[in-house]
Amino acid sequence: MVPVIALVGRPNVGKSTLFNRLTKTRDAIVAEYAGLTRDRQYGEAKWQGRTYIVIDTGGISGDEEGIDAKMAEQSLQAIEEADAVLFMVDSRAGMTAADQLIAEHLRKRNKRSFLVANKVDTVDPDIARAEFSPLGLGDALPIAAAHGRGINAMLEAALGIFPRDDEGEEGEGEAEVVAEGEEPKRVPGPSEKDGIKIAIIGRPNVGKSTLVNRMLGEERVIVYDQAGTTRDSIYIPFERDEDKYTLIDTAGVRRRGKIFEAVEKFSVVKTLQAIQDANVVIFVMDAREGVVEHDLNLLGFVLETGRALVIALNKWDGMEPGQRDYVKIELERRLMFADFADIHFISALHGTGVGHLYKSVQAAFQSAVTRWPTSRLTRILEDAVQEHQPPLVNGRRIKLRYAHLGGANPPLIVIHGNQVEAVPKAYTRYLENTYRRVLKLVGTPIRIEYKGGDNPYEGKKNSLTERQVNKKRRLMSHHKKAEKKRRDKKR
């Protein structure tokens, strides 16, 4: 499971600077859910091939209202959700009363905490360690977040306590080579044992719990329910029509005898972890409310992680025909960026349309993990280029030579050629749509990566042989004589 790291500390100690450095915010998946997260900011980060989630909390001043009152706003929940805490202090300002209150709270919560002394670029690290040793959280890890100093050592300490998942998900990452002439194939992964892992996500009160109960209803064969390693998330294997699935529930469903009691409990961390761990995401929206901003935020995270997607519009049965038409128009307008996903209009309460979700889940999963030979992908590229050539760059045509599969879940197609760094985004979208249409991909994002061929002669001066030099001299002499004869003739 993806580790969760919370950044905690009083105001202006550099939490946001460290957050931006860890997540590389320009490229990172950063989601801010106002009103739901109480101003906490969540981001996905990677270090040495490991993925983890970072929570940037608000500053804690420790004023007369007390540490608990302040932390209840945002930081207390972040600490509870986190696997480990990076407690940041300011080396320049030294230890304060607020630092002592926060350290005391962390010790009481018995959380895995690492003391991080920021801004050591102008302070001796040994002095900083001695300054904060009374906090009782071990030796401080000295860093300079603004300049990136000490970050690797800090991450080594914080992430080293978690087991490395070296196995990963089969079907992800680098794809194995499919021999020329072979048919596309799907390679069995861990999901063959536990079934396709489905995460049902969405805003609070859109009907996630009702849908979970409906999918695990009396007509289904429930094998067992087992608490996962994530806080309050439950992994529930079940079968339907002899197909195996594992439902990742983030709504707090608990089994009591034959009754599943649903407790609506929204947690951004649980949602993000469920998305990361799933093969397919069923995204639930409330048809009566249409598409709202929080839906777009969550959908954006799903697309960035590359997970296969099925959209379910719940509470459809109670709507008038005019309302339904309006919602469909809004969906088409606002969800253009996810137009590859199947949309189902359902009633989780009455079961209407729920059974059709499984067909889309299967299709999305197959599209996400199927592998194609290089010959097929290259032929599709050649046909696409012949139909619509890439633009000219400085008078030279961009050349796309061949394509191969670079990964799956989501499919990654690597295209080799010349001047590929100049390929416009519009042309990349054209290629994505072409591959999606020809390969009949549904329910999964598709990614295209370009690789250019290095010019072995770049930066090298061409040296001529003696024979070539003599030939060049003769040609130049001949050219001069011909030019002189032409001028004399004009006179």
From Swiss-Prot:
CDD domains: EngA1, EngA2. Residues 164-191, 452-491 are annotated as: Disordered. Pfam families: KH_dom-like (PF14714), MMR_HSR1 (PF01926). Residues 3-166, 196-369 form the EngA-type G domain. Residues 470-491 have a biased composition (Basic residues). Belongs to the TRAFAC class TrmE-Era-EngA-EngB-Septin-like GTPase superfamily. EngA (Der) GTPase family. GTPase that plays an essential role in the late steps of ribosome biogenesis. NCBIfam families: GTPase_EngA, small_GTP. This is GTPase Der. It comes from Azotobacter vinelandii (strain DJ / ATCC BAA-1303). The lineage of its organism: Bacteria, Pseudomonadati, Pseudomonadota, Gammaproteobacteria, Pseudomonadales. The gene is der.
